[in-house]
Amino acid sequence: MTKNILFIMFDQLRFDYLSCAGHKTIKTPNIDRLASMGVRFSNCYVQSPVCGASRMSTYTGRYVSSHGAAWNNVPLKVGELTLGDHLRKAGMDSWLIGKTHMAVDTDGMERLGLANDSIIGARVSEAGFDIWLRDDGLWAYGPDGYYDEKKSPYNEYLKLKGYEGENPWADFANAGIDENNQMTSGWFMRHANIAANIEEEDSETPWLTSEAIKFISEKKEKPWLCHLSYIKPHWPYIVPAPYNEMYNASDVVDVIRSKSELEDTHPVFKAFMENTIGKTFSRNEVREVVIPAYMGLIKQCDDQMGRLFKYLKESGEMDNTIIVLTSDHGDYLGDHWLGEKDLFHAQSVKVPLIIYDPSHQADCTRGMVSDALVEAIDLTASFVEHASGEVPKHILEGKSLWPIVHGQQKELDRDFVVSEYDYSQQKMAKSLGVQPKDARLFMIADKEWKFMHAEGGFRPMLFDLKKDPHELNDLGADSAYQNIIDIMYQRLGRWSLRMSQRTTIDDEAIEKKQSSNSDVGIILGVYDDNEISDRSSSFYKGLAKGRYSSQN
């Protein structure tokens, strides 16, 4: 029987903020244990370092410029096949618990007459998943209304638990309380060391874990993929007790940045450094307050993994469940004078990836760390191959990871990885005077070099990953490296010319047409009927049916 897939995604979890990835102070024993049971990939890159675009690439198995949902709240167009579409065709259900950042193509839905409450319409509206529970986790509200107008399942849960008010997420889960009974909102990062005013078991991460356990206990009738998509450790940086006190400033690792990054800085890089987030995270006192909270959020996530894995083992599901654990992007946390994500340094574009396969084929790689060049879109290809035995390569642009997980090969057939970023909706594009069509960045990276191209007439960026693994010395303006830059531009050009839009017919069908002997009466390039067989010409010879033209 096909094994189930538990596809766990955290939001904004850095690749290097796990103890199994070498972090010096954070302890993540449960995720570490999963890594010891499976394969940990140390070179996994997302296809865009921002929530929405990254997730849409993961859910479609396609690059951002293929699916078009290039930033947050940009709709994924109707007709773009998703993970759920491929899996259901193979007989496997695809369920969501948590976050997707999916924006609905309302115009496309209306054009096709798809109702949101129909089965097909609901799936198209939710990145192809059937919904057990969806909550994107940001229930902010201000003078102009709510950031997200949808009804929050988490808020309804909190109300049932006795938390008061219209928006208990904002009042309790995202706020602490001081000695004067004043709210200390998580939106203001100076409050990051204050515990959220909520029972730990009622906070977002345990809530989603409980829903996952409930789902697994009930779904027994057919194989499933469950996308357990956690909201944390994404900002706001606030965590309930006791996690708010587990780490302090002494646990914060040294910042990765240099004064040289402030000199002759690439204009796009500089614009992001000079925005509010970059300036704030460049202050040491901010890092000393925020990062311990971020670590506390990760520790809570790890504890919930322990709870979830314990249930899987005790219920007998561990041996029947493939577990994949990853993130949608990272978090700069002040490295490179930046906050948030958005650009292509490792802190932002690389993510953790662990794959545990209980089958005997994976016994030879348990505990292995693979440095193969991996892209997040490889997950969809892997899931589809697991369910159906083959990957529709004319649609999916990723590569199956099972040959590595099963010890059949060390590397994928890939020379480089690609990531894209569209910053046209951000203020930085306006400050740079860049038109929306040109506010785009492209990354090409292998194990030695990382290259960034910026549309709009800017110079490239280049980093020597062997000599400069922290990416502190931009070589993009150094003529001594022009040959490397030329190679990277050749790669970018080759990638840009890929066949990405011919998704309704595969190469096998095309090749059959090339050699087809089917004769349906289309005769081209023939001067005389004697040049072809009687079988082909006989339909167009012989006595005429009658005379109707007066000209004959």
Locations of the language-model features?
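Formylglycine-dependent sulfatase
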Residues: 1-452, 460, 469-490, 522-552
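Short, acidic/hydrophobic/Gly-rich beta-strand patch recurrent on exposed beta strands
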Residues: 464
